[in-house]
Design a protein with these regions (language model features):
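Bacterial Sec-dependent N-terminal signal peptides
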Residues: 1-31
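Extracytoplasmic cysteine-anchoring/structural motifs
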Residues: 20-330
Length: 330
């Protein structure tokens, strides 16, 4: 009986040690990882009107191990590497990351209603198509769904509570008709427009090269489509441009939207632009604008009496932001 008691005591001690060892091991492993939560938001947080990120509803992200040659990691938690719904231009992402390690994070936000963009996550490349991939034909003009945003964060140390602001890799090109010109049309209005210009089809998302476009510009044709405010009678979808008044102050000035399109450009570009506009009486108006400046994450606005005085127009480039994040990546 005494011998049995001794064996039982030793067994209990051994089991207790094993339990403690398992607990310590689990605690040690837990300390090696951080359950990181960070927020992704869009830089364009203004009113939800045309040209204001109204259709962005998905964000994809890639996580790369810097110490392991930038290797793309497999999904790290219950959330898969893929699309997460946006809510009020924000998305919250939860991932488990190793404590003390550096990561590169790549985010790309887009509209689920467009197939204009694809990301090669292994090679960290953004590919842009100006065709309708379903039909193989040129895409339509004035599609808000072609809007997109990105951000690359290098050498991120696992932490929580971080907010990343995404900016457009695109320039927004607009044409706006003055209200006096609109009045001169005596009730007629422009209902459709098309665009012919040049833009790039690929951009790097790579380490130290992100934001660099690749290759040469390609010809881009966006086919005739409804203008963004064709059914608007209250001015809600006006093109609002900051124009200098007589004292040199920038004043918000409304124009009738005739054209709005997104183009992948280098940090700054000069392109030739042709806009064809269809009036509701069936008349076509074609306007050519040479050497128009485009700038990534900015709005280039061609404004004036574009119908009655085709050779009298103004080019105004406004920052695309409505908040304090007034810096485009590269």
């Amino acid at each position: 009986m005494r011998k049995f008691t001794t064996i039982l005591a030793v067994l209990c001690v051994a089991l207790g040690f094993a339990c403690c060892s398992t607990s310590d091991s689990e605690e040690s492993v837990a300390k090696q990882y951080i359950d990181a939560t960070f927020t992704v938001e869009l830089s364009d947080l203004g009113t939800r009107s045309a040209g204001k990120a109204t259709m962005i509803d998905k964000v994809e992200y890639g996580i790369y191990d810097v110490a392991d040659g930038g290797r793309l990691l497999a999904p790290i938690s219950s959330k898969e590497l893929g699309a997460i719904d946006f809510d009020e231009s924000k998305a919250v992402i939860d991932v488990r990351l190793a404590a003390g390690k550096k990561y590169d994070l790549v985010f790309f936000a887009y509209s689920s209603k467009s197939n204009a963009y694809s990301v090669d996550w292994e090679n960290r490349l953004l590919n842009v198509s100006y065709k309708n991939t379903a039909t193989g034909k040129n895409d339509l003009a004035n599609l808000e769904s072609r809007d997109a945003f990105f951000h690359v964060e290098q050498d991120f140390l696992a932490s929580t509570g971080k907010t990343f602001v995404l900016n457009r890799p695109l320039a927004q090109l607009n044409a706006g008709q003055s209200y006096s010109d609109f009045a001169n049309m005596l009730g007629n209005k422009i209902i459709k427009s098309s665009l012919t210009t040049q833009a790039y089809t690929q951009m790097s998302l790579g380490r130290d090269t992100y934001g660099n476009v690749l290759g040469s510009k390609s010809d881009v044709v966006f086919e005739l489509n409804d203008v963004v405010d064709v059914d608007d009678t209250e001015g809600n979808d006006d093109l609002v441009v900051k124009v200098a008044d007589a004292e040199g102050n920038a004043v918000d000035t409304p124009y009738k939207h005739l054209s709005m399109n997104y183009l992948l450009v280098n940090s700054k570009e000069l392109v030739n632009v042709e806009i064809t506009m269809l009036g509701d009486e069936g008349t076509l108006f074609t306007r050519n604008y040479p050497n128009i400046p485009l700038e990534r994450n900015y709005r280039t606005n061609i404004i004036g009496n574009l119908i009655s005085s085709p050779f009298e127009f103004e080019i105004v480039v406004n920052p695309i932001f409505t908040n304090d994040h007034n810096q485009a990546q590269k």
